[in-house]
UniProtKB/Swiss-Prot annotation:
This is Nuclear pore complex protein Nup153. Part of the nuclear pore complex (NPC). Interacts with TPR (via coiled coil region); the interaction is direct and provides a link between the core structure and the TPR-containing nuclear basket of the nuclear pore complex (NPC). Interacts with HIKESHI. Interacts with SENP2. Interacts with XPO5. Interacts with RAN; the interaction occurs in a GTP- and GDP-independent manner. Interacts with MCM3AP; this interaction is required for MCM3AP localization at the nuclear pore complex. Interacts with MAPK1. Belongs to the NUP153 family. PANTHER family: NUCLEAR PORE COMPLEX PROTEIN NUP (PTHR23193), NUCLEAR PORE COMPLEX PROTEIN NUP153 (PTHR23193:SF23). Zn(2+) 1 binds at C660, C663, C674, C677. The keyword Chloroplast does not apply. Binds at least 4 zinc ions per subunit. Sequence repeats lie at residues 237-238, 648-649, 710-711, 778-779, 894-895, 915-916, 950-951, 972-973, 989-990, 1013-1014, 1073-1074, 1107-1108, 1124-1125, 1161-1162, 1200-1201, 1216-1217, 1228-1229, 1263-1264, 1276-1277, 1278-1279, 1293-1294, 1306-1307, 1314-1315, 1328-1329, 1350-1351, 1362-1363, 1371-1372, 1384-1385, 1404-1405. Zn(2+) 4 binds at C848, C851, C862, C865. Keywords: DNA-binding, Isopeptide bond, Membrane, Metal-binding, mRNA transport, Nuclear pore complex, Nucleus, Protein transport, Repeat, Translocation, Transport, Ubl conjugation, Zinc, Zinc-finger.
Length: 1462
């Protein structure tokens, strides 16, 4: 309609619409130019011109020229028609908003006012327009919309003359509305409305013309008008809803009408307008909506105002303004959509629509007045929302049909259309659009509407009868909108039906849709196809409404099994769904209220009952399971819409209802289960009491509620008790609060008393508490229960029976005191819960002197800071304290040196992980334990025992070790010197221990075995070696400890240098992480991580993977296990810089194989040991110069960076950067010079002073070390400079290797040790950073092989080794070349961390004035953390750890990176 007028053209094809648009060409959709620029006055004047003459004329002409005008009406008239009737109606009504457009009908209104009065009949139409566009669609669309809409929206559709009439009318409207540019602007100018109305009236035959018919016509015209005068068409919204459901479409009977723009402009163009016509019999409703909303603002008083005034106001209203348009939007109304439409809109509309149809021609004014109260605008708005295009087209089509059909038929058809539309809505709309001009707005939608219209046409007669009741009933709108509602059952149905007979339901549905245009199928639209099918299949669905009742369901299943099947696959589902569908459809069709009554039986409550009754089960026993769930689900929806009201009211009746204890919902007496929560109906009070459960109390309450007066329902059941904790009311039988589980006051207190007594609290205040807190007074509720006690910690009041605070679980003060032997607190707990006693300090409580926290009497330690109670003696040992207790519990003591005799301590301190305890992992303390047998069971971290010695030399006499079998323990950094109580100082961080043990066995005090971080430990190697020889201990993961037992299975000794004697050849290599187990026997290499095992005699000694320590073979005991920055100077004694980080340890003893610096990080270990003095195992930056000469045979098994120079060919433990010259079994970076395998010397620079026996071991992967030593290149010495002449540094990172003989062994010269370059001329597997004299396969710094290594500068033709600077400037290493290769510990100025060179670029801790200061000619202390110059020596001999000692500091320029701020 709007499309017709506005180019949207009534349903005329787009052409008409366009023509009309051309007509309206001057008038733009929101033409503010002409109409609005005209101004209200001009508009009003124009309106006045057309009002009386045009409007009245049209009014008469409508009746006279129903056909001719109907086209006009179609174009503008349908909308004006609506305006007339609607305007009259709406003018009086609040719906005048539509009339706003119709306002031109004020004059018409005068004429049509009777019509408007008839609109009173039309009031429903008015309602329909605004709220019941659906209803109007249902009725009017079917009735008058067919007539009016057809002409206007699609003249071709019902009214052939309408087609031309529409054009004609458009012209009329246009001509008349030429003046009515206002209407153009507003979309429906009041004049246009008048003209249209007049035409509409003409179009609408008096009988056909009902306010609805006219409205439908007017709706179409409104659309036409909208087309004519573009305006925001709310109908678009309504149309959408139409697509959603016919109810929506019906609601948006004036889909073409835009709540925003009274003009013809609608979304979807002509199609939208057509949809409006089709959708609703009240085509004007769409326009009315537009105008009406505007009018409603201005026009509510129009009923009283004169037609002229009305027109003027309407003209003003019609002017589309954002506000007016916004008001027209049905968004808010959309929700009212259902209720108003369903109730007043549909119900009233159906009945009133008929009346209006009859009366509409008669005084519309009266009806207008009636409609005013209607919240139609809202409803209209709602309708608008529902569907955009479809509603307009449907409206028009429906209007045409409606005109043809009786008003009742129209209504029923519109309902059907609604249903169909919900199912078919868009297709139907589209069909009308295609068929008639009305489809011009939305061709597709129009066509579908026509189809619907066709469907509607047969249906209208049936629907008329049924719909009269149904429309008034909510169920009708519900049926439209209930589609979603029914969809509940439908979804269920669809789910279950597929199994039973989904095919049947679909065909039936189709048939029903086509065949059963009758009212019953109409409702089916809400539910999916299934419902529709059943509705058609089962006309007796009305009877079926009882289906909701289980019995009813059974009947349907039995009688209408096929129909039911159609509805839902499951028999039960089918039964439920079918009955619901039947009931809903037929009942809504027959009478809107009838379904509700039937639904009463079939209501959700009933459904819920049915499971209880089992009659539904009876219906389909097999299907029951499925049915139960689906039925329950389905029925509630049905009952909710139709019968819930009645049944709910009944349920409220005391006699006929019982209250669910669970959800407090009133259920019917017949319901065995709560309809809401499905809780079973509770037996009577007696039964419940017998049951003894909480349920009886609930049932009692409901019983009392129903039985007693209204107030009694709110009275607590007799015997109920309020929880004094959470104030929740509990049933009499409840012993505990259901919410907080607090015991019932009477019982709880008694329990508390008993408990209190039972609890051993000496002071039983509970006895006094025994008094039950039974006082019933109100204040008593707030009184603390007798015997309750307040938690001194969190101040929560606890019951007497509680032994612990419910909140913080603190023990009850009395109980605690009883346990603690301080009974006083008990009285406190039992006593002063209420008074100021709360603030009294509990007896026996004590304040912590440290943190002032109040502690319970029984607490021996402060709960906050764990400080010992002032009076008590704290067993807790401080971190650095030494515990002298022999049996000190091995409680993972961190830094405590326990000075207890090692033997007793060892025996007693087993099993516990003492962190710093002497027995366990002593971090910075030296534990002197005489030989203690049991000592190592605990995970002693730094304990000298065999327990997991990290960087500590473990010096335990073999006998002792045998006795102890301490190996088990995981000594992290301790050296286990069992014999010597003080043997290995566990994990000495910065301490330099210069204790020389004359005897290897008596290493006890001198061996700072435990993880001496930066300490230089000078211990005589003898003690450790002797100790080691006999026993196998050290099975336990000695991390950095130096295990001196010959057999010592140094299990993962991290950095301990284990000087093991030849005595125990069976040394088990237990993964000593940094520990060097130097056992004379070919001890299996224990992965000594940083430890160097130096075994003088045992060529076979396999060094466990010594990680980064350089074991000086001079002294069998490298005690400074993991000595960080300590330079350990132990000549004869086993200097054990185990894991000496940057310790430079000159060890004078060659004979003693004990690798001293186990895992010397930056430690420079100088061991003169001839026999492959264990080179610093895993000496990180440590440069160890060992003079040990028997390196040749050492097979460094995977020693990481250690260069092993031991005469024996012990299995070399994977030395990372160590170069094992001789048979070095894949020492990673190890250059194994000596038969002794070096334990993974990480960056330590092992300097085999005199080890010439082997070809110069290429120092394996010396990170920043310059290895100038010929023989042994430090195995992966990180920053250490290896001065061994022969060492071809294998993969020396920043080190310059001067040793030419670096076999390309990956790390070792012979075996593919990682960073080890083997001096042997034999081609070695390419060592990663090692330089192989024979072949330089990625060899670092090997003179023979020139491939440039990354940072290595080889003075010879060697390719620059990675970090090595032979002659070229290594990265951080300072060589003679001084080429900066950034050798980390190199003495070169290039970024020398610990470089000796004065130009130490970034020399970290190196003392570098002398390039060879590290005792290595190459002087490239590549990242030698502890070169001889104090490099990073924490506790080193007077060397400042972090100060680069030497002029290098002065020479070095460090630029701090400064972030530039933009």
């Amino acid at each position: 309609m709007a499309s017709e007028a506005g180019g949207i053209g009534g349903g005329g094809g787009g052409g008409k619409i366009r023509t009309r648009r051309c007509h309206q060409g001057p008038v733009k959709p929101y033409q503010q130019g002409r109409p609005q620029h005209q101004g209200i006055l001009s508009r009003v004047t124009e309106s006045v011109k057309n009002i009386v003459p045009g409007w009245l004329q049209r009014y008469f002409n409508k009746s006279e020229n129903a056909c001719s005008c109907s086209p006009d009406a179609d174009e503008v008239p349908p909308w004006p028609e609506n305006r007339e009737d609607e305007h009259a109606i709406y003018a009086d009504e609040n719906t005048n908003t539509d009339d706003g457009r119709i306002t031109p009908d004020p004059a018409g209104s005068n004429t049509e006012e009777p019509s408007t009065t008839s609109t009173a009949s039309n009031y429903p139409d008015v309602l329909t327009r605004p709220s019941l566009h659906r209803s109007h669609l249902n009725f009017s669309v079917l009735e008058s919309p067919a007539l009016h809409c057809q002409p206007s929206t699609s003249s071709a559709f019902p009214i052939g003359s309408s087609g031309f009439s529409l054009v004609k009318e458009i012209k009329d409207s246009t001509s008349q509305h030429d003046d009515d540019n206002i209407s153009t602007t507003s979309g429906f100018s009041s004049r246009a409305s008048e003209k249209d109305i007049a035409v509409s009236k003409n179009t609408s035959l008096p009988p056909l013309w009902s306010p609805e018919a006219e409205r439908s016509h007017s709706l179409s015209q409104h659309t036409a008008i909208s087309s004519k005068k573009p305006a925001f068409n709310l109908s678009a919204f309504g149309t959408l809803s139409t697509s959603l459901g016919n109810s929506s479409i019906l609601k948006t009977s004036q889909l073409g009408d835009s709540p925003f723009y009274p003009g013809k402009t609608t979304y979807g163009g002509a199609a939208a307008a057509v949809r409006q016509n089709k959708v609703r019999s009240t085509p004007y409703q769409a326009p009315v909506r537009r105008q009406m909303k505007a009018k409603q603002l201005n026009a509510q008083s129009y009923g009283v105002t004169s037609s002229t005034a009305r027109r003027i106001l309407q003209s003003l209203e019609k002017m589309s303004s954002p506000l007016a348009d916004a008001k027209r939007i049905p968004s808010a109304v959309s929700s009212p959509l259902n209720s108003p439409l369903d109730r007043s809109g549909i119900d009233n509309t159906v009945f009133q629509a008929k009346k209006e149809k009859v009366d509409s021609q008669y005084p519309p004014v009266q009806r207008l007045m009636t409609p005013k109260p209607v919240s139609i605008a809202t409803n209209r708005t709602v309708y608008f929302k529902p569907s955009l295009t479809p509603s307009g087209d449907l409206r028009k089509t429906n209007q045409r049909i409606d005109k043809k059909n009786s008003t009742v038929d129209e209504k029923s058809i519109s309902r059907q259309n609604r249903e169909q539309e919900s199912g078919f809505s868009y297709p139907n709309f589209s069909i009308p659009a295609a068929n008639g001009l009305s489809s011009g707005v939305g061709g597709g939608g129009g066509k579908m509407r026509r189809e619907r219209t066709h469907f509607v046409a047969p249906k209208p007669p049936e629907n008329e009868e049924v719909e009269a009741p149904l429309l008034p009933q909510i169920s009708l709108p519900i049926s439209s909108s209930s589609l979603p509602t029914f969809s509940f059952s439908s979804p269920v149905t669809s789910a279950s039906p597929s199994p039973v007979s989904s095919s049947q339901p679909l065909p039936n549905k189709v048939q029903m849709t086509s065949l059963g245009s009758t009212g019953s199928p109409v409702f089916t639209f809400s539910s999916p196809i299934v419902k529709s099918t059943q509705a058609a299949v089962l006309p007796p669905a009305s009877i079926g409404f009882t289906f909701s009742v289980p019995l009813a369901k059974t009947e349907f299943s039995g009688s209408n099994s096929s129909s039911e099947t159609v509805l839902s696959s499951s028999a039960q589902d089918i039964t439920a769904v079918n009955s619901s569908s039947y009931k809903k459809r037929s009942a809504p069709c027959e009478d809107p209220f009838t379904p509700a009554k039937i639904l009463r039986e079939g209501s959700v409550l009933d459904i819920l009952k049915t499971p209880g009754f089992a009659s539904p089960k009876v219906d389909s026993p097999a299907l029951q399971p499925t049915t139960t769930s689906s039925i329950v689900y389905t029925r509630p929806a049905i009952s909710t819409f139709s019968s819930s009201g009645i049944e709910y009211g009944e349920s409220l009746k005391a006699g006929s209802s019982w209250q669910c204890d669970t959800c407090l919902l009133q259920n019917k007496v017949t319901d065995n289960k709560c309809i809401a929560c499905q809780a079973a109906k509770l037996p009577l009070k007696e039964t419940a009491k017998q049951t003894g459960t909480g349920t009886p109390s609930k049932s009692d309450k409901p019983a009392s509620t129903s039985g007693t007066g209204f107030g009694d329902k709110f009275k607590p059941a007799i015997g109920t008790w309020d929880c004094d904790t959470c104030l929740v009311q509990n049933k009499p039988e409840a012993v505990k609060c259901v919410a907080c589980e607090t015991p019932k006051p009477g019982t709880g207190v008694k329990r508390a008393l008993t408990l209190t007594v039972a609890s051993e609290s000496p002071v039983t205040a509970s006895s006094s508490t025994t008094v039950t807190t039974g006082t019933l007074g109100f204040g008593d509720k707030f009184k603390r229960p007798v015997g309750s006690w307040e938690c001194p910690v969190c101040c929560v009041c606890n019951k007497a029976e509680d032994n612990r605070c419910v909140s913080c679980t603190s023990e009850k003060p009395g109980l605690v005191s009883a346990s603690s032997s301080s009974p006083a607190p008990v009285s406190l707990s039992s006593g002063g819960c209420l008074g100021l006693d709360k603030f009294k300090k509990p007896e026996g409580s004590w304040d912590c002197e440290v943190c002032l926290v109040q502690n319970k009497a029984d607490s021996a330690k402060c709960i906050a800071c764990e400080s010992a109670k002032p009076g008590t003696k704290s067993e807790f040992k401080g971190f650095g304290t030494s515990s002298s207790l022999n049996p000190a519990p091995s409680a993972f003591k961190f830094g405590i040196p326990s000075s207890s005799s090692g033997l007793s301590q060892t025996l007693t301190s087993t099993g516990n992980f003492k962190f710093g305890d002497q027995g366990g992992f002593k971090l910075g303390t030296s534990s002197d334990s005489g030989s203690t047998n049991t000592m190592n069971t605990n995970f002693k971290f730094s304990k000298p025992t065999g327990d997991f010695k990290f960087g500590v030399l473990s010096d335990s006499k073999p006998e002792e070790v045998k006795n102890d079998n301490k190996n088990d323990n995981f000594q992290f950094g301790s050296s286990s010197g069992l014999t010597n109580p003080a043997s290995s100082a566990p994990f000495q961080f910065g301490v330099s221990t210069l204790g020389q043990q004359e005897k290897k066995e008596e290493l006890p005090k001198s061996s700072p075995a435990g993880f001496s971080f930066g300490a230089g430990v000078n211990n005589p190697p003898n003690a450790a070696i002797d100790t080691t020889a006999t026993s196998e201990n050290k099975s336990g993961f000695n991390f950095g400890t130096l295990d001196t037992k010959s057999v010592s299975v140094t299990p993962f000794t991290y950095k301990t240098t284990e000087a093991k004697k030849e005595d125990a050849p069976a040394t088990k290599g237990g993964f000593t992480f940094g520990k060097v187990g130097s056992s004379s026997l070919p001890s299996s290499s224990m992965f000594v991580l940083g430890r160097t095992e130096e075994k003088q005699q045992e060529p076979v000694t396999s060094t466990s993977l010594v990680f980064g320590k350089k074991a000086d073979s001079e002294e069998p005991k490298c005690q400074p296990v993991f000595s960080f920055g300590n330079s350990e100077q132990t000549k004869d004694e086993s200097s054990k810089p185990t894991f000496s980080f940057s310790v430079a340890k000159p060890s004078g003893k060659e004979s003693e194989q004990l690798a001293k610096a186990t895992f010397a990080f930056g430690n420079q270990t100088n061991t003169t040991t001839d026999q492959g003095a264990a080179k610093p195992v895993f000496s990180f930056l440590n440069s160890s110069s060992s003079s040990s000469s028997a390196p040749a045979t050492s097979s460094s098994g995977g020693i990481f960076g250690s260069s092993t120079s031991s005469s024996n060919p012990p299995v070399a433990a994977f030395v990372f950067g160590q170069a094992s010259n001789p048979v070095s079994s894949s020492a990673f970076g190890n250059a194994a010079e000596s038969s002794t395998s070096q334990s993974l010397l990480f960056p330590q620079e092992s300097e085999p002073a005199t080890t010439s026996s082997t070809a110069p071991a290429a120092s394996p992967f010396v990170f920043g070390t310059g290895a100038s030593s010929n023989s042994v290149s430090s195995g992966f010495t990180f920053g250490a400079t290896t001065t061994s002449s022969s060492s071809g540094s294998s993969f020396v990172f920043g080190t310059g290797h001067s040793a030419p003989s670096a076999s390309p062994a990956f790390g070792a010269n012979q075996t593919p040790t990682f960073g080890q370059s083997q001096g042997a001329s034999q081609p070695n597997p390419p060592s990663f950073g090692s330089i192989s004299s024979s072949t330089a396969l990625f060899s670092a710094g090997s003179q023979p092989v020139p491939p440039p290594i990354f940072g290595t500068v080889s003075s010879s033709s060697q390719p620059p080794v990675f970090g090595q600077q032979p002659s070229q400037s290594a990265f951080g290493s300072g060589t003679a070349n001084a080429s900066s290769v950034f050798q980390f510990g190199s003495s070169t100025t290039n970024f020398n961390f610990t470089n000796n060179n004065p130009s130490g670029v970034f020399t970290f801790g190196a003392s570098p004035s002398t390039p060879a200061a590290s005792a290595q000619p190459s002087g490239s202390g590549v990242f030698s953390f502890s070169q001889s110059p104090a490099s990073f020596t924490v506790g080193s001999n007077g060397k400042n750890m972090f100060s680069s000692s030497g002029t290098s500091v002065s020479g070095r320029k460090i630029k701090t990176a400064v972030r530039r701020k933009k």
